[in-house]
Amino acid sequence: MSEAEPSVVVAEQCRRSACDRCRGQKLRCERPVSNSSTTPCRRCLKAHVRCVTTAQPHRTKPLSSLQYLHHTESNYDPHSATVAGQLPVAAVAGLGDLDPSLLHMTGVQNPRRLSHSSSMANPVDSRPPGRTRRLSNPDHFLPHPPLHPNGVLDTDGTPLLDSIDHLPDMTASRGFGFSAALTPHSPSGSSDFFDYFRPMAEDNNRSPWMDAFTNLPPDHREGTPAGSNYRGSLTGENQFRSSLQSSRGLNGFETPQRESRHREMDIVSIKNECIARMGKLNRGLLQDVGLVNSGKVAGTLLFSQASRSTYLEVEKGRKGGQNYVIGKMLHSSKELLDILKQLERCKSTLFPPGHTERTTSTADEVTTAMTETTTLNQTGSHAPSSPLGGNPLPPLSGPLSASASHSSSCASSSSASASTSGASLLSSSTSAPSTSPAISLQLDTTLTLLFLTGYTSVIQLYEGVFSFIRDSVAANPSGSNFLPTLPKLQVDGFEVGSSTRDLQICILLQVSTHILNQIEERLHAIRDRAEGHVPAALLDTILDRSDPSQRGAKGRELCRIVRDIKEHLKHYAE
């Protein structure tokens, strides 16, 4: 019997391993008695931690399913499980009444659930690598993958599925799902902080702030769950339609007050963007007006930047037709028109306090379509509102204007039919009021003054350019061309060269009339919506609305110049 004892000691020494704490930290386990597995090591004694040693099996080959089940049940130690269960309780004991959802996101086990989950957990897993653990009672746990990022790792680096607590359902969340993880457990039921992290769909050719007011219909109405925005496919891919509506309130339902607040913030951002664009545009317009009024623009210098050293620095970096005075004039007019269209899309910006919009989204779409169709088909005399503060400019006559007038009449008839059908649809759709809250935000005085400065500068620029063209046409025969460097134009694939002087001037007058008509249409619309406020009084100083036949000084002068130019052209002289 005495000879068998050394063999037993040798067998135990071969099977002995480091304690659980040293093995988890990958440190050398130092024991006072080398052949004793019950004596605590020096590191555990210094840390005042109970030293637990669990024998590890020889991992020569993977165990079968039946062998693995028997092996797991035979190695279950209730005392070790109780000791390991005390560690997470001590870790979270100082957290107080922390939100349970934060414990879910960080992976820490909820101490309120340890009473039943710690007894089921095996802190030291002895399964072979590459095999998932089988749960004896799967009803207490969620069927998540074994390598979930929220799982707590064992001492050997393998995840413990028992430590994964309840995870929030992200399938019905919007955006990145931050608010869905905290809102159900929030004491106040609010997720205002996470509302600012929702993604926004940006388009390259349009401002991102405009998407909430243009073509995107509202995803939900009041009382509709946010989960209806989710659409699944048979292939397992999740398709989310991008939406810029306000974030949902408590339990995923829409809150009208929050939606109104976010829309007001977006409107203020749009106005700030328009102010910045108008400031940049007015600086360029004032430089162009100063150059034209200085008398230095003569002959070809109207269309070329040669011999204009002071103007070269301003024009440095520009390409194409914008290097010419006429090119810059048309470009500035188009920029002013784009800014006015941007404000027109956001109709709530132009409402003074006390005004409410009674139409639904269908009526808004019909109105927008009618406006765009009418704008694209209107030229010259068919403009509904007066250009330059009065009646439309005189229509073109002659061979060129005959076809233009015919096409304009066709466009006018089609516009009339479209407006008739649109009016019937509009009357049927305006019967029900909109459920979205009306936003009253008046157009401020700063933006109105910027619009007036830009509009008067554009009129002065057109007046200076057309005055030079009028004087040159009257002083030169109809066959000669005083515009040798006029940029070539493309009209339906036909290139208009420098030899066709009259045709170039006709096209320039027609394009200018069309742009100015649209600019003044939108200024009149802004003035109508600002009735009784300071912006309306400021616009009345430029837009003469008392008598349409009486234009302002600038408008009357520009119309007279255009008539003189047309009288001297060859097609109109005949």
Curated annotation (Swiss-Prot):
InterPro entries: Zn2-C6_fun-type_DNA-bd_sf, Zn2Cys6_DnaBD. Its main location: nucleus. Residues 111-133, 242-262, 376-404 are annotated as: Disordered. CDD domains: GAL4. Keywords: DNA-binding, Metal-binding, Nucleus, Transcription, Transcription regulation, Zinc. The keyword Nucleus applies. It comes from the Eukaryota. It is found in: Nucleus. One of its GO terms (molecular function) is DNA-binding transcription factor activity, RNA polymerase II-specific. GO terms for cellular component: nucleus. Residues 19-51 bind DNA. Transcription factor that positively regulates the expression of the gene cluster that mediates the biosynthesis of oxaleimides, cytotoxic compounds containing an unusual disubstituted succinimide moiety. This is C6 finger transcription factor poxB. The lineage of its organism: Eukaryota, Fungi, Dikarya, Ascomycota, Pezizomycotina. The gene is poxB.
